[in-house]
Amino acid sequence: MVEKKSSPAEEKEYIEMRYGRNLNFAFADRAKELIKKRIATKVIDKDEHDEEENYHFLAGNQDEQDFQDTFLDSSLNEANHGEDHDGGISGEVDSQEEPHNGLVSTIPPEPIEMSTIEEEQSVEEDAGRCALRVCPERDVFLFPSGMASIFTAHRLLLQWDSLRLNRSRNGSDVTSSPPNKKTVIFGFPYADTLHVLQGFNETYFLGEGDESSMKELTKILHSGEQILAVFIETPSNPLLKMGNLLELKRLSELFGFFIIIDETVGGIVNIDGLPFADIVCSSLTKTFSGDSNVIGGSMVLNPQSRVYEFASRFMQLEDEYEDLLWCEDAIYLERNSRDFIARTIRINYSTEYLLDKILKPHVGENKLFKKIYYPNLTSKETLTNYDMVRCKKEGGYGGLFSLTFHDEDHAAAFYDNLKLNKGPSLGTNFTLAFPYTLMTYYHELDMAEKFGVERNLLRISVGLESQSILGKIFQEAIDKTVEI
């Protein structure tokens, strides 16, 4: 069979469509509205969608301009309306089938309600969690990156604390000023998060992120010291540990600190974190987008938080917050995220298949792998804590896991024999392998190992490849490595 070559014109058209060089800027605001709607709908665990929900525009609720052939509902988006080849989320895609074009997705998009923008999403009270109503336009904020959202959340709380200090100074006769409250980093986080939080405030770094860290936090609080906030990843990167959010919430109500969750690794499809947080941050670059052609971040305010009114005013100040998500990025982020629920569910299934059928038999003494880090494998404590906040309907354990090895040579050989894309991101539609510790903490290896992040740790982010293909790739890498 002679392979058909693309013409230069076709290649140019594909690149322009794929990387957003032919977009109409006029639709950027509409794209941002849809992104916020999408986040607001899933940031609260909600079992059922309204019967009248539609993918993009709901007839009868839009003006005439919405019915014109725009980028947001043009033929380019028809690629997102395809069905799985086998009719199911967890089924495998025939990798030999000729693709229709560069924009085709084999996974159907999730329904997104397109009624009025001001309509709020709600969830009924369940298992002791308070009902929440999140307004997309008032409570969801977009950023050019996930780290920008975390930095802004931290700066917001530092500003809150500075007002407390000013009130204390103005109302006190003593000459000494009250100290700034410290920030607690709970668990071993993404490297940039650690450096940002430590660089802009005094911190307690409780890197274990388990029951021992909770006891240490409780000891600090009972000593009489007030803390500003606890930052926690759900779960942590790269050890996939999960702290006890219910206990953190109880302590926050008792001692008056705030909780900021970074749910990038778990994702809003899998984790119902907002009821236990004052602010939820996320990188939209990862699973929410998936296509690896756009960067973005989000921040969601909990309307029931003590800091909500202050945070809402803070985010309206031009000197404090500006929506810097580039217009073309917003349009492509909207397109990419239409099927993020279906992609997340598929990745959940593929990851558990890969772990159960291929990797777990090779874990243990005198075997290739020393340990697998994954929310249902890291520890019983992590599994219990994760399941307490896992979304009821679609929630799984995510597509990220880490492997450690008994032998450094085996780690290198396995990585070399793993015929996958290699890179530092996660949540992409294609599977990625990354020697996390060496690449991220090369100059701080001893510090990382102190918290269980071994230098030979290999992090895997599972994509949308079929289970059979992934299984074959990993099995071949295992077979070649054990021959050494």
Describe the function of each predicted region:
Residues M1, D173, P178-K181, L359, ...:
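Conserved C-terminal alpha-helix-loop-beta "cap" of PLP-dependent enzymes
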Residues M1-E78, G82-D84, G91-E92, Q96, ...:
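PLP-dependent enzyme catalytic core of the Aspartate aminotransferase-like
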Residues A59-N61, Q68-D73, D126-L368, Y373, ...:
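Conserved PLP-enzyme active-site core in the AAT-like
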Residues F310, H410-F414, L470-F474:
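Hydrophobic side chains in well-ordered alpha-helices
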